[in-house]
From Swiss-Prot:
The gene is rlmG. CDD domains: AdoMet_MTases. One of its GO terms (cellular component) is cytoplasm. This is Ribosomal RNA large subunit methyltransferase G. It catalyses: guanosine(1835) in 23S rRNA + S-adenosyl-L-methionine = N(2)-methylguanosine(1835) in 23S rRNA + S-adenosyl-L-homocysteine + H(+). It comes from Yersinia enterocolitica serotype O:8 / biotype 1B (strain NCTC 13174 / 8081). It is an enzyme of class 2 (transferase).
Length: 396
């Protein structure tokens, strides 16, 4: 937890999910301060205030009095925003949380954007704004200086209107954009589509899906050794576009599939890919936006497939992967298996062996390893995820 003065208000802010030994990582950054210093709150006239990509709810807390709409593709960011509102005794009911797939309110007065990591997501958001902004809408964006590129400015210019950037302050920069009645090139397609090699499938990806334009090389390696003829329920945890679950669905005709991700666009892409490629199997599928396997019944899964991330936005961390492993252990039946693919340097083997009491390398190459851990009766009571671990992340 860290305390920060934003404008004239002091806030206690935490990253989410909470992490042990994370004192060096703050829930806010200089770009948040810089944005708030440059917003003229006197201009807000009761019309909607929109905040985009507010990772931990910092801007939403600071603008709470103006009943903001907080727009994000990340369910984790929504949980973080709600957490920090509660932490500061702010009324959650006056904040509207919107996903990246939701319609935006008309004629906003103020739009505050934290520049996202994916340029495609920024383009999607700017095009969505173009449909609702008014001529007097104030648009201001911010990010670390290293994340503001010519391509970023060109997107604002092309879609919304005249754009200028500020000098750097504490290694952060701002973008000011005026709404102009400019001709817009043809509408961008809602998804990027490409054929999946060695299959008859076509993969559809929304803007914020990892490896949007081609098959992730880790997923490609993983797909080569997915199991056949599993009975019971299989979870594609951190499913992305659902390509791993799609192949698992084909190879396991008696199984049910659960597609889970914290990205709204990822889950929407997964559902689109099953609908388009295997509509006959939709009745065997469930699609869920969630923080890991929260809400999934204990000991209800036979197999968990996972290609875990090793970063949270720009911060490199395997904490999210660890939470996924713990959730998998909690939700697997005794005898159920967790199969993961990961970069060799991440040393997931020893983490899984410590958590499950066993781990097997199924395949490896110069970059990736595919590992399997089995939930045994003896490991059943030794920790298990979702905040109730006997074994903590710091043990590793």
């Amino acid at each position: 937890m860290s305390q920060v003065l934003l404008g004239t208000q002091s806030f206690e802010l935490e990253r989410f999910p909470p992490q042990e030994n994370s004192n060096t990582l703050q829930a806010w950054e200089a770009a948040d301060e810089y944005l708030l210093q440059n917003i003229d709150l006197n201009q807000i006239d009761g019309r909607p205030v929109l905040v985009f990509n507010d990772q931990f709810g910092t801007l939403t807390c600071a603008l709470h009095a103006y009943r903001p709409f907080s727009v994000s593709d990340s369910y984790m960011s929504q949980l973080a925003t709600a957490h920090n509102l509660r932490l500061n005794h702010l009324d959650e009911d006056v904040v509207t949380l919107l996903s990246s797939m939701d319609a935006l309110p008309e004629a906003p007065k103020l739009v505050v954007i934290k520049i996202p990591k994916a340029l495609a997501l920024l383009e999607h958001q700017l095009r969505a704004l173009r449909r609702v902004v008014a001529p007097d809408t104030v648009i201001i964006a911010g990010a670390k200086s290293r994340d503001v590129h010519n391509s970023t400015l060109q997107l604002f210019e092309k879609i919304l209107g005249p754009t200028k950037t500020t000098l750097a302050w504490k290694k952060a920069r701002l973008i000011h954009c005026e709404v102009a009645d400019i001709p817009l090139a043809e509408e961008a397609p809602e998804t990027v589509d490409w054929p999946l090699a060695n299959t008859e499938y076509v993969i559809h990806n929304h803007a914020n899906v990892f490896s949007r334009n081609n098959l992730d090389i880790g997923a490609r390696f993983f797909m080569e050794i997915l199991p056949y003829d599993v009975e019971g329920k299989i979870a594609d945890l951190g499913c992305g576009n659902g390509v791993v679950g799609l192949i698992a669905l084909e190879q396991n005709p008696l199984a049910e599939m659960l597609f889970v991700d914290e990205s709204y666009m990822a889950v929407a892409s997964s559902e689109l890919n099953i609908t388009y490629n295997r509509p006959q199997d939709l009745s065997r599928c469930e699609f869920m936006v969630s923080h890991g396997l929260a809400g999934v019944e204990r000991e209800s899964l036979q197999l968990v497939l996972c290609n875990p991330p090793f970063h949270q936005q720009h911060a490199v961390s395997d904490h999210v992967a660890w939470q996924m492993f713990c959730d998998a252990k909690r939700c697997l039946k005794v005898g159920g298996e967790l199969m993961i693919v990961g970069n060799r340097h991440l040393d997931y083997f020893h983490k899984l062996k410590r958590l499950f009491g066993n781990c097997e390398t199924l395949d490896s190459n110069q970059k990736f390893m595919v590992l399997k851990a089995v939930k045994t009766a003896s490991s059943r009571s030794e920790g298990g995820g979702s905040g109730s671990l006997d074994m903590s992340y710091s043990d590793f």
